[in-house]
A protein has these predicted regions:
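Intrinsically disordered, low-complexity polar regions and short flexible loop motifs
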Residues: 26-261
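Sec-dependent bacterial lipoprotein signal peptides
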Residues: 1-24
């Protein structure tokens, strides 16, 4: 989806935790009336319209492992194991889960009888979409963020972009458009997701910088932001053993509308 260039830096300082809280009513997005297509990690998946799954009192949930290393994870929702053996940087397709108050639990793959390494409580709303991210917080502890996916289309001729900062040792991040040095996002804290933002649809190069600094740590080249599409840039790594990396996710509403709405 785009090319990465990592620039070595020294003296990276972690910021204090600003964790996301998964609560009822935290999402203002409406269920989509169209199916969605997702491209991530070279794989494409399709999910039904939000309004279609709402008729069954279900929500749409996908899982991303943003914890650098070799550990693969299983994710549970209440008593059901919903995703298994998910490796680092892998994004699962959307799956339908009950729209209810419940508990997400994260375990190393295959360790079903052990205590979870992270827990997140909250409510899934009928017909809405969520990305659950396994990451480390600013103190290096495993955590789960349940992030609403507002896949309402961007303005005419625009693309939408958001950033998730899962690089726990990197600290605050700025994302800058290289061509005109325009900040798209500033001061994105660790363990935080921005809202989607409308941007010009164009091929561009983006720089990721430590908050308030002028020198890029990561350059994202050949970023082709297409009109009507929605992009998530997940920052991860940035440790002594794993360089700062970006996991790109591309979503779009398909032309077809699910029947039975």
């Amino acid at each position: 989806m785009f090319k990465l260039l990592t620039i070595t830096t020294h003296g990276i300082i972690a910021t204090s935790l600003l964790s996301l809280v998964f609560l009822a009513g935290c999402s203002n997005s409406k269920p989509t009336i169209q199916d969605t297509e997702t491209n991530a990690g070279g794989q494409t998946s399709v999910a039904p319209a939000g309004r279609a799954v709402a008729k069954q009192n279900m929500a749409l949930v996908r899982f991303l492992n943003a914890d650098p290393g070799t550990t693969r994870y299983d994710l549970w929702f209440d008593k059901a194991k919903t995703y298994t053996n998910v490796r680092y940087q892998r994004l699962t397709p959307y799956d339908e889960l009950p729209a209810t108050h419940g508990e997400f639990r994260l375990r190393a793959s295959g360790w079903d009888d052990t205590e979870p390494v992270a827990i997140q409580l909250g409510r899934l709303e009928s017909g809405k979409r969520y990305t659950v991210v396994a990451l480390r917080d600013a103190e290096g502890n495993m955590a789960l963020d349940v992030i609403p996916d507002n896949l309402a289309p961007p303005s005419n001729g625009k693309a939408k972009v958001r950033v998730i900062n899962a690089a726990f040792e990197f600290g605050q991040a700025d994302v800058i458009r290289q061509s005109d040095n325009k900040p798209l996002f500033t001061g994105v804290n660790v363990d935080t997701a921005t809202d989607y933002k409308d941007v010009d649809a164009a091929a561009t190069t983006l720089e990721v910088r430590e908050g308030g600094h002028n020198r890029p740590t990561l350059i994202l080249s050949a970023v082709n932001l297409k009109a009507g599409k929605m992009y998530t840039i997940v920052m991860t790594g940035g440790t002594a053993s794993t360089p700062l990396q970006a996991i790109p996710i591309e979503d779009e509403l398909t032309q077809g509308v699910t029947l039975g709405l």
